[in-house]
């Protein structure tokens, strides 16, 4: 923390203090002070970007939005995102692949994976490639139905289980295939 004679207090990273050679009693011109403020803003945005990326998978757009939401100047946020991209710490394609892999591990359907990509603000240009690798979820659906229906199930339990699968992003046709494998398909089940 640096305190100026006029009472202004600035929280600076050690690197910024060293870059400007700050010490007690240093006289600064207005121009030097403005450069210090700009450098402090840049460093703040970069360090916050590093913390965000270390905590979760984010796209370029999502990182910039989060930096601005946390109080960073939009210019500093944009520069910090570009700095992270240049250092190959933010890669939208890699993030999209990680999101889809996480959805597969959780047993979500393609619709839920698309929703996750949208929520993370992944550009749509990457969606087709990463979703093309999505495996068939019929075995997962069958396993889910077997685990949640048990022996003494009725129409109400079947309806709940299929609704849960729909919420998890599986399509009617995929659920229909799972029901057919278990010989549980009823005439009431919709086509799509």
Question: Model segments located where?
Answer:
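An alpha-helical, amphipathic repeat domain used for nucleic-acid recognition
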Residues: 1-192
């Amino acid at each position: 923390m640096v305190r100026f004679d006029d009472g202004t207090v600035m929280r600076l990273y050690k690197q910024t203090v060293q870059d400007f050679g700050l010490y007690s009693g240093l006289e600064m011109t207005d121009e030097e002070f403005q450069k210090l403020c700009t450098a402090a803003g840049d460093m703040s945005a970069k360090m916050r970007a590093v913390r965000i990326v270390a905590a979760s998978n984010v796209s370029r757009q999502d990182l910039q939005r989060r930096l601005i939401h946390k109080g960073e100047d939009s210019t500093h946020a944009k520069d910090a995102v570009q700095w992270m991209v240049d250092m190959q710490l933010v890669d939208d394609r890699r993030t999209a692949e990680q999101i889809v892999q996480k959805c597969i591990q959780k047993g979500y359907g393609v619709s839920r994976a698309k929703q996750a990509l949208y929520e993370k603000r992944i550009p749509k240009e990457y969606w087709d490639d990463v979703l093309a690798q999505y495996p068939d979820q019929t075995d997962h659906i069958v396993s889910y139905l077997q685990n949640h229906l048990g022996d003494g199930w009725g129409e109400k339990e079947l309806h709940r289980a299929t609704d849960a699968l729909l919420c998890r992003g599986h399509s009617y046709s995929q659920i229909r295939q799972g029901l057919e494998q278990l010989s549980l398909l009823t005439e009431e089940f919709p086509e799509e």
